[in-house]
Amino acid sequence: MRLFVSRRVKRWKIFHFFVTCFILSFMVFWSPINNYIMSHMKSYSYRYLVNSYGFVNNSLSLKHSSVQPHYPYLINHREKCQAQDVLLLLFIKTAPENYGRRSAIRKTWGNENYVQSQLNANIKILFALGTPGPLKGKELQKRLIGEDQVYKDIIQQDFIDSFHNLTSKFLLQFSWANTFCPHAKFLMTADDDIFIHMPNLIEYLQGLEQIGVRDFWIGHVHRGGPPVRDKSSKYYVPYEMYKWPAYPDYTAGAAYVVSRDVAAKIYEASQTLNSSMYIDDVFMGLCANKVGILPQDHVFFSGEGKIPYHPCIYEKMMTSHGHLQDLQDLWIEATHPKVKNISKGFFGQIYCRLIKIVLLCRLTYRNSYPCWAAFA
């Protein structure tokens, strides 16, 4: 009996020890977790107000005496889409030194001739960039000029190409579209490490064109996101720049598409708001909020993560983010004819449904396609 009681006491002490350790750990780690959770809960609670009322826009509006900075073009192709029926005007945000990325895109999803001959669509693709920093010198600029003389697909304005000038690059894109290609049915902007399944995208946009879609803006939507107040983060936004606890809804800058009428409205709004907000996708959300445009979430536009590699995923994919070395291999695999046949028939549909559930419905956060994309 004593032995039994002794064991129970020992087990209770061990249990008490682990409970104490858990509580202490919880107390130590709860503060940053709590701050993160509370920050997002607070920002999401403000989301309706930020999206519905004009006080945010009023606080960011330019004074009548102020104008947006205007940078001259160093490289331009004003004739790129003149007198043509353009389905899609696609800007790729790139850095001067990223020649390898531009080259891979030209050989894969960014090949205009492929889209014209194989997909029966006229699209125009331009790489948008600023100037090399002072440390990179004139040599890189000379190489850019030489590259453009070969491919004729670069537009460049005279601002330093850097993270804090992303909004200047945003203004370059929408200004160019408004000035030189306002008749394009759709405008898309994408990073240079993105993969776009061009056959799927073109088929989707052609269907939308036929029904005359308007007020259209799709991508991977961030809802009620809070400004980052951590000074060590590159996304840090001081209160002086943006004092509200939540941003208007916006799409991830990795890739999004807007219709022609939205592109025109965004350009007009961009000329009235303070462009010191250097996070370009947030600035896009501010412009859209001013003109009453809300983004639509598309489950096959990825966030910051790569999609799982599998033909069942490729069947409906639109974009995937973070591709630096595998772009050409992925292009060959994702556009292979077998992809369109893999889910045919009853058993094909069941097979792909199960594969997508396994690949997309994971407990670990991937930031690519959501679980419900497996059922789309």
From Swiss-Prot:
GO biological process terms, semicolon-separated: central nervous system development; protein glycosylation; sphingolipid biosynthetic process
Reactions catalysed: a beta-D-Gal-(1->4)-beta-D-Glc-(1<->1)-Cer(d18:1(4E)) + UDP-N-acetyl-alpha-D-glucosamine = a beta-D-GlcNAc-(1->3)-beta-D-Gal-(1->4)-beta-D-Glc-(1<->1)-Cer(d18:1(4E)) + UDP + H(+); a neolactoside nLc4Cer(d18:1(4E)) + UDP-N-acetyl-alpha-D-glucosamine = a neolactoside IV(3)-beta-GlcNAc-nLc4Cer(d18:1(4E)) + UDP + H(+)
GO cellular component, one term: Golgi membrane
Glycan-modified residues: 57
Keyword annotations from UniProtKB, A to Z: Developmental protein, Glycoprotein, Glycosyltransferase, Golgi apparatus, Lipid metabolism, Membrane, Signal-anchor, Transferase, Transmembrane, Transmembrane helix
Pathways per UniProt: Protein modification; protein glycosylation
EC number of this enzyme: 2.4.1.206
TM helices/strands, residue ranges: 14-34
Cytoplasmic side: 1-13
GO molecular function, one term: lactosylceramide 1,3-N-acetyl-beta-D-glucosaminyltransferase activity
Topological category with respect to the lipid bilayer: Single-pass type II membrane protein
Tissues expressed in: Highly expressed in adult spleen, placenta and cerebellar Purkinje cells where it colocalizes with HNK-1. Expressed at lower level in brain, lung, thymus and muscle.
Homology family: Belongs to the glycosyltransferase 31 family.
Protein's recorded name: Lactosylceramide 1,3-N-acetyl-beta-D-glucosaminyltransferase
Gene: B3gnt5
